[in-house]
């Protein structure tokens, strides 16, 4: 066991305490694998920017190109992946030491430029898609809707009747025609008859009211006369002396 002496302790017979010193291996000081492979590629060395302006301008030139967008981009991104896109990262599991899992293939982004194959193949693909769309456009037929609306019933013609005849006959003859004058005369006669009938009914009601009022006066006069006769009879019976044939006369007077 390796021990280190701590300086600064008194040497007058006191024993020096032995403590383990922190020794590190020079190879383990940094992260594993960084110092062992100085020639490893950087993280973003294999990536490059893609300029889509050429593709957008070329697609904007064709108006009916919606059906070919997926195929164009599939061909665009898959054309350069066939030339060896799978490569192993050098020294993957070997850098960590000991046996490790089987190396996995890493997908590598292709280094495209402005003059590569996708840019050169795109105009031909655009032209082919444009020809296909133009050839399919005349033969295309509109697809039926998923849930067609029920056919609307046409409104049935109105049934002939008096209302329709009356509406059709509203338009009368001209005012200067004899038929119009005859119709006006008939209307005037009917109005006069209705007015005369209302007047007669009103007169009859007034006459009946007068008769009932006169009869009421007669009845009131009759009631007054009977009341006077009753009062005279009472006075007459009060003046008579009590007789044996009138047993209840005194009781009646007492009341």
From Swiss-Prot:
Domain called bZIP: residue spans: 177-240
Bias (Basic and acidic residues) ranges: 163-187
Classification via Pfam families: bZIP_2
Tree of life domain: Eukaryota
Record GO cellular component, one term: nucleus
Subunit (UniProt): Binds DNA as a homodimer and as a heterodimer. Can form stable heterodimers with CEBPA, CEBPB and CEBPE. Directly interacts with SPI1/PU.1; this interaction does not affect DNA-binding properties of each partner. Interacts with PRDM16.
Protein name, per record: CCAAT/enhancer-binding protein delta
Record lineage: Eukaryota, Metazoa, Chordata, Craniata, Vertebrata
Gene, per the UniProt record: CEBPD
